[in-house]
């Protein structure tokens, strides 16, 4: 009997900077992920897709990213989440830690986001 092909890991990506959203979507799809990209929280909350990992910018036009993660998790499954931001302060770090949300700092260089996603979805190559 032939093996069934496994489905790609689904990433929900929310970033209001259009060029960064496009670049991240391209890079993650090139890595084999299925990406659902959004530029704001509201459209995502209206019809959230099934997701294996959330990657969300902190500063969005209609809601902060940590609040969005908490609202999405309250709707059902609680996938791992990664918050992307610039210069997170101690208060944000504590709040993210309490919510079991990883933080990756911008600029997104050196593959840190890719490593965090792979670790979050259990595909780390240690």
Where are these regions (language model features)?
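Two-component/phosphorelay signaling modules centered on CheY-like receiver
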Residues: 18-36
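The feature encodes the CheY-like receiver
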Residues: 61
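Acidic, metal-coordinating helix/loop segments flanking the phosphotransfer/catalytic sites
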Residues: 37-53
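Acidic catalytic/metal-coordinating carboxylates
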Residues: 39-40, 64-67
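Alpha4 helix (beta4-alpha4-beta5 surface) of REC/receiver domains from two-component response regulators
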Residues: 88-105, 115
């Amino acid at each position: 009997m032939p093996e069934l092909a496994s489905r790609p890991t689904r990433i929900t990506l929310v970033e209001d900077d259009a060029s960064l959203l496009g670049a991240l979507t391209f890079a993650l799809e090139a890595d084999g992920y299925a990406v659902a990209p959004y530029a704001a929280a509201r459209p995502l909350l209206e019809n959230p897709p099934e997701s294996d990992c959330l990657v969300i910018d902190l500063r969005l036009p209609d809601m902060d990213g940590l609040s969005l993660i908490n609202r999405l998790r309250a709707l059902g499954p609680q996938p791992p989440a990664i918050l992307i931001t610039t210069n997170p302060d101690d208060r944000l770090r504590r709040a993210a830690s309490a919510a079991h949300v990883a933080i990756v700092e911008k600029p997104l260089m050196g593959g840190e986001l890719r490593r965090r996603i792979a670790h979050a979805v259990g595909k780390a190559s240690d």
